[in-house]
Amino acid sequence: MSDLVRDRLDRALAALETVDEAAARDVIAGDDAVDRRYLELESTCIQLFAQQQPVAGDLRFVAASFKILTDLERVADLAVNLAQYTLEADRKRFAEVDLSAIGDLACRMLDDAMTAYRTDDAALCREVAARDDELDSLCQRASERVVRDLIEREAADGDGWAVERVLDDVSRLLLIVRDLERVGDHAVNVAARTLYMIESDPELV
């Protein structure tokens, strides 16, 4: 499931960076495959609860896996959002805004969170959570840059860069930043559930 979701996210980010509309449509069309896989694994978790009645560490593992599935499915939904923005927004107007650094950090956080889950690495869980502030800071700076560029270009170009002409693009670009930040939030959720699974520690939950 995580590999499928990461593939969708990678494709969405690449489409966004290169303004590849065909790739963006492929991401959107592929969401059904993610949803089907999610439902299959959700059913498996429910069956384990009902038939095996896990306790202690086994119970924490199944419960954490169930929650993590939901986070991964939501990341896939965010990838669809990013693909949709590729089809709708004019990135050329805000080419200076670096979304790649935000996307790279969010993806690394998600990768590390899943590695922590697979390897029972509590320290890595805490590292993922600690990087959330860095991601938030990148997102904040990007959002400020978008607004500043809008103001500066409107002042310089007058009617040629009227606010009403670019308001939709500004809104969508801010939504892109927000959704990338949410990918990081879901990575932190995965890390938190994993830490609880490993140590029965609700520190990050």
Name these PLM-found stretches.
Residues 1-205:
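Cytosolic, long alpha-helical scaffolding segments
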